[in-house]
Amino acid sequence: MDTMDKLQFLCFEFKNFAKNRGPMSSLSQLEQDLKQFRALPYHSDTQLAQKLSEVQAWQRGRIHKTHQALFASANNQAMGEFLIDQLYGGEKFNVLAEQLERMVQKAEKLEKFIPANAVSTGAAGIIEAINAIKLDLQLAQYLQENHLSVDEPSMIKAYRSVNAESARRQQIADLKQMCYRTDKYLKSFILQKAFSLAKSTAYKKGFQPLYDFIAEGFAAIKPIKSIGAFIEP
């Protein structure tokens, strides 16, 4: 049995094993979120883009500081960096989103060689990153409109003024769910094998950005001994 036959067999077995939604619903949602992301005003406003970048940098520093003990563990460092870089990645995420916009038009081909749950998990992670940008953009807009710098007193004012507490709580809940889902699928030998075999095909078909994003998430979460201890307060 050659590599392609193995890949098709494992994907078939995984589809029988998995009962969750296929990739198309997740990718359809991702396509809509990418369109909304591209329409965000900071793409055409350099001053607002700079303010958002400063807000994201502040958020990265805050998270590193408040979770210093958690990230100090060697097993947790990779996942901590992955979450922070993806949620507050700035220009790095802009490049990824641009690549994904071109890729998602051909999304129906994905189900032929990448396990559905791996794709849906990757799509969920990107959607979470877009949601984080939307929330931080609200803060950046407030700071810009009120001519405030990005520091702790100003950020406290911005958080209170924007009053997006429920949206922030939902963001945390969705992020936890994504982490649990990723951890669950990572424990599946069938998914891991099928996903690994799909790499060369994914690259050849032009799906490298999404494949690499999923692979980075899997690699980051793998060393964690207890995902519950990592994400629950």
Predicted features and spans:
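Extended, well-ordered protein cores
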Residues: S25-P233
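Intrinsic-disorder-associated, low-complexity terminal segments enriched in Asp/Asn/His/Tyr and depleted
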Residues: D2-D5, N16, N20
